[in-house]
Amino acid sequence: QRQMCIRDRSKLSLDHLNILPDKYAIHPSVNKDIATFHLNEPCDISFEPDGCNSPLILFCNELETDIPSKNDPNVIYFGPGEHNPENGLIRLGSNQTLYLAGGAVVNAGIEATGDNITICGRGILDGSDWEHNAGPTDYMINAKNCNNLVMRDIICLLYTSDAADD
């Protein structure tokens, strides 16, 4: 099994550093503004240099093995980098796969209609440029009349809400 070494240089004080969840019992060594710790297994953790404020969320995953071919005509493939699909909208139909590679940030909403649709990858679907109910779709992922819709591993940044301003 592989071990991962993480080093983080923080502008915030590390005097009250928490690494959560506690079940992983991660005890970093701290030298001035650098915290160092090791992970022995895939996990998602919150690195909190100033208690619960300003966390750094780390998704430490197994290596991805089920990557669709970017040459497959039924695959819409976004590689690493920022992507802005036309009109901020991705339409998926039957037997299509949307793949967001690790490091991809796709600024869009999705409309899916049909059978055997897959949305996957380690990338980010980002709807934060739009206010709630004002994006290219009513919902960030708008699935209608779908059978066997599979969504796995993507990270979604949802449409923003102005409720906090009220």
Q: Which role fits each region the language model picked out?
A:
Residues 2-6, 162-166:
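Short, small-residue-biased leader/transition segments that mark boundaries at the very start
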